[in-house]
Amino acid sequence: MLSLFNRLPWLHRVLITAFSAIIVFAIFFLPNSEDLRKPDAQREVGRHYPVTLDNQLVSTPEEEVIAPPSVMLRWETYQVANGESAALLFQRAGLSSRVLYELTSSNSDINNQLSKLMPKDELKFGFDKDNQLVQLKRTISPYETFVVTRSDSGFTSEFDKKEVTFQLNYAEAKITSNFWNAGVTAGLSANQIIELANMFGWDIDFALDIREGDQFKLLYQEKIVEGSVIGRGNIIAATFINQGSTFTAILDDNTGNYYDQNGRAMKKAFLRSPLDFRRVSSNFNPRRLHPVTGQIKAHRGTDYVAPVGTPIWAAGDGVVEKSSYNQFNGNYVYIRHSNTYITKYLHLQRRLVKTGERVKQGQTIGTLGGTGRVTGPHLHYEFLVNGIHKNPRTVELPQAQSLTGKAKETFIANAKQRMEKLERYSQLLYANQ
């Protein structure tokens, strides 16, 4: 039998050996029919059985979120021109009056925003692929935007406000030419320069009293939106050294007014200067030469040179005692502030108040001019105490109401902290120089 197998071709012998091995494996290792019919091979309906799956073969998406399709908008920005209404602007943007009507009739906020447009305001229009208005935006401030969105029921609106935080900043300067230039050099805005002058305007005449070498320091707020500075806030503490005298002003958060370290009001009953600080032609001098006659004539007041038409302010609350004209004073206004004080304003271009009228401190009572006996346009200002002429720059002025009681205690504690911060910032600045 073996000799017969050996006489077979080589390929046949290999195939016979392979098939024989398969048959032997099947006999000894595969289950028989009885094993297949055993209960553990059967599955009951409704029963859960553990199943092992290869994680590589089965993929399970992790919380897949299907977002609604977003609408890509084409944005166009339009700036309101002088004298342009919402209707004209919408027409320029290619929108019909019907769209404007739909917007303004949707709610009062939309109507108010579109009816109060001012020159240089910007409107942003968002159009879809069919050129239909989907969204409208109006920037109210760097941190607030009015947003209108089309919905199934018409237009809806909301005020999108960004969170505003505050940080402190510091500035200082020494005056070398004039106060305004010193403020600019210190990095202050025009509003801050004016605010600083207003804070100390009851103690310092910024038109006459400023000298080379005067200096100031201030601590002020900066508005922060999304990490960027978008504007300036209040000045919270400041010092001003004028001709060797130091003045201090600190903001009271409750009243919004400024006081010194002891809670005394910076505001006085009278302003030192009845107009914006400008170049002046003469100081208080009771024995000056008259500009026309050349004779010695008492010059019981102060002359302020400024552009014709500059607003002139009432130095304090009072009643207009006289508003008239004569060949010497030109247009003039006298104001009685009490039985003690009278202020006079001469050579006005225009008088804006009448005799008997009540006026408030800072109210415009006229404009600077050159009427009457003058060599050039200017304001002549006089300050009388019990009928006697006083230098308005140096006369002691009555104070406005100061803080008392608990309000004073709270303010003094806060004032101490703010002045300490002011000094720390000053020291840090010098340490880094």
Swiss-Prot record:
It is a single-pass membrane protein. Disruption phenotype: Grows as wild-type in LB medium. Synthetically lethal with shyA. ShyC shyB double deletion mutant has no growth or shape defect in LB medium. Coiled coil: none annotated. Disulfide bonds: none annotated. Its EC number is 3.4.24.-. Zn(2+) binds at residues 299, 303, 380. GO terms for molecular function: metalloendopeptidase activity. Reduced activity in 0.5 mM EDTA and a complete loss of activity at higher EDTA concentrations. Binds 1 zinc ion per subunit. InterPro entries: Cell_wall_metabolism_enzyme, Csd3_N2, Dup_hybrid_motif, OapA_N, Peptidase_M23. The keyword Protein biosynthesis does not apply. One of its GO terms (cellular component) is plasma membrane. It is found in: Cell inner membrane. Cell wall peptidoglycan (PG) DD-endopeptidase. Hydrolyzes peptide cross-links which covalently connect adjacent PG strands probably to allow insertion of new glycans and thus cell wall expansion. Degrades purified whole PG sacculi in vitro. Belongs to the peptidase M23B family. This is Peptidoglycan DD-endopeptidase ShyC. The gene is shyC.
